[in-house]
C-alpha cells in the first residue's frame, strides 16, 4: 500500500497478464533469432549426418554464448538509457 496515496497504482490482473504475454513474445523472438542466426552460421544446408559433428556443435555453443551475451549487454544499455531519459524528464522511466 502506498504512503498517503502517493505511490504508483498496482497493476491489474489484465495488465499483469499482458506484461507476461509481452515478455513471452520477446523471449520467443530472441530464441527464434538465435536459432536462425546460429544455424545459418554453423550448420550447412546439406545435412551429411543425422547428428551434429564436433565442429558444428562447438560452433553452435560459441554462437549461442555470444548471441546471449550480446543480447544481455544491449538490454543493459537500453535500460541505462531509459533510466537516464526518465531522470531527465523528471519522472519514472519505462524501464
Swiss-Prot record:
Query: Which one of the record's GO molecular function terms can you name?
Result: metal ion binding
Q: Motif Twin CX3C motif, which positions?
A: 38-63
Disulphide bridges, residue numbers: 38-63, 42-59
Task: Write down the InterPro entries for this protein, in alphabetical order.
Answer: Tim10-like (IPR004217), Tim10-like_dom_sf (IPR035427)
Protein keywords = Chaperone, Disulfide bond, Membrane, Metal-binding, Mitochondrion, Mitochondrion inner membrane, Protein transport, Translocation, Transport, Zinc
Cellular location(s) = Mitochondrion inner membrane
Provide one Gene Ontology biological process annotation. protein insertion into mitochondrial inner membrane
* SUPFAM superfamilies on file: Tim10-like (SSF144122)
| Gene Ontology cellular component list | mitochondrial inner membrane
Membrane disposition? Peripheral membrane protein
First-listed, main subcellular location of the protein, grouped into a coarse class: mitochondrion
- Please name the Gene3D superfamilies in this protein's record: Mitochondrial import inner membrane translocase subunit tim13 like domains
Instruction: Tell me the protein family, please.
Output: Belongs to the small Tim family.
Q: How does it assemble?
A: Heterohexamer; composed of 3 copies of TIM9 and 3 copies of TIM10, named soluble 70 kDa complex. Associates directly with the TIM22 complex, whose core is composed of TIM22 and TIM54. Interacts with the transmembrane regions of multi-pass transmembrane proteins in transit.
What does the domain comment read? Answer: The twin CX3C motif contains 4 conserved Cys residues that form 2 disulfide bonds in the mitochondrial intermembrane space. However, during the transit of TIM10 from cytoplasm into mitochondrion, the Cys residues probably coordinate zinc, thereby preventing folding and allowing its transfer across mitochondrial outer membrane.
Q: Could you tell me which PANTHER family the record lists for this protein?
A: MITOCHONDRIAL IMPORT INNER MEMBRANE TRANSLOCASE SUBUNIT TIM10
Function recorded in the entry = Mitochondrial intermembrane chaperone that participates in the import and insertion of multi-pass transmembrane proteins into the mitochondrial inner membrane. Also required for the transfer of beta-barrel precursors from the TOM complex to the sorting and assembly machinery (SAM complex) of the outer membrane. Acts as a chaperone-like protein that protects the hydrophobic precursors from aggregation and guide them through the mitochondrial intermembrane space.
- This protein is called what? Mitochondrial import inner membrane translocase subunit TIM10
Origin organism is Gibberella zeae (strain ATCC MYA-4620 / CBS 123657 / FGSC 9075 / NRRL 31084 / PH-1)
Amino acid at each position: 500500500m502506498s504512503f498517503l496515496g502517493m505511490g504508483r497504482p498496482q497493476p491489474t490482473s489484465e495488465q499483469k497478464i499482458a506484461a507476461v504475454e509481452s515478455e513471452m513474445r520477446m523471449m520467443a523472438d530472441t530464441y527464434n533469432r538465435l536459432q536462425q542466426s546460429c544455424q545459418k552460421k554453423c550448420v550447412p544446408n546439406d545435412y551429411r549426418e543425422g547428428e551434429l559433428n564436433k565442429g558444428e556443435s562447438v560452433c553452435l555453443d560459441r554462437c549461442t554464448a555470444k548471441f546471449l551475451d550480446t543480447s544481455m549487454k544491449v538490454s543493459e544499455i537500453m535500460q541505462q538509457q531509459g533510466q537516464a531519459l526518465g531522470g531527465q524528464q523528471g519522472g519514472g522511466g519505462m524501464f
